[in-house]
Amino acid sequence: MTTIVSVRRNNQVVIAGDGQVSLGNTVMKGNARKVRRLYHNKVLAGFAGGTADAFTLFERFEAKLEMHQGHLLKSAVELAKDWRSDKMLRKLEAMLVVADTESSLIITGNGDVVQPEYDLIAIGSGGNYAHASALALLQNTELSAEEIAEKSLTIAGDICVFTNQFKTIEKLDY
């Protein structure tokens, strides 16, 4: 699996992810990029789950963004509808975290689109560790969104065997 974390604070939104790709108990790759910029660099997206499945979802989500002129929520809901109703897509095992300057969302294979509390999202095998540490940092420090995402991903990587210390961090300032 992997860990993806998104933090929003002080006119900045960040999505960060580790780079580990595992096949069973074997590390296949340590420097995968699971966080990307989409739609003219105005949308950030990260994935946890099957890599091939996630790339399929990235492509479909980007097509939805183009169709809806970059409207994040509408694109996410339309992708979730397709994901839930299409027999081929229903078999895909991945989750997406997406964000723009206005919203941060989780899109699941069950057709859920969730806007989180505290402008904080963490998914994947190390998601609970990243979430707990990021929430503590949000509530008790003045660190930037980028610093919180980086530190919480480091903590998750120290605890979760399916999360490593290679990080991809993308941010939008607004």
UniProtKB/Swiss-Prot annotation:
Positions of transmembrane segments: none
Residues bound to Na(+): G157, C160, T163
Assigned EC number: 3.4.25.2
InterPro entries: ATP-dep_Prtase_HsIV_su, Ntn_hydrolases_N, Proteasome_sua/b, Proteasome_suB-type
Subcellular location: Cytoplasm
Any one GO MF annotation of this record: metal ion binding
CDD domains linked to this entry: protease_HslV (cd01913)
Gene Ontology terms: biological process: proteolysis involved in protein catabolic process
Active-site residues from the entry: T2
Main localization of the protein described in the UniProt heading: cytoplasm
Catalyzed reactions per annotation: ATP-dependent cleavage of peptide bonds with broad specificity
Assigned keywords, A-Z: Allosteric enzyme, Cytoplasm, Hydrolase, Metal-binding, Protease, Sodium, Threonine protease
Family of this protein: Belongs to the peptidase T1B family. HslV subfamily.
Chain's role: Protease subunit of a proteasome-like degradation complex believed to be a general protein degrading machinery.
Alphabetized PANTHER family for the sequence: ATP-DEPENDENT PROTEASE SUBUNIT HSLV, METALLOPROTEASE TLDD
Quaternary assembly: A double ring-shaped homohexamer of HslV is capped on each side by a ring-shaped HslU homohexamer. The assembly of the HslU/HslV complex is dependent on binding of ATP.
Protein name per UniProt: ATP-dependent protease subunit HslV
Biological classification of the source: Bacteria, Pseudomonadati, Pseudomonadota, Gammaproteobacteria, Alteromonadales
Gene that this sequence comes from: hslV
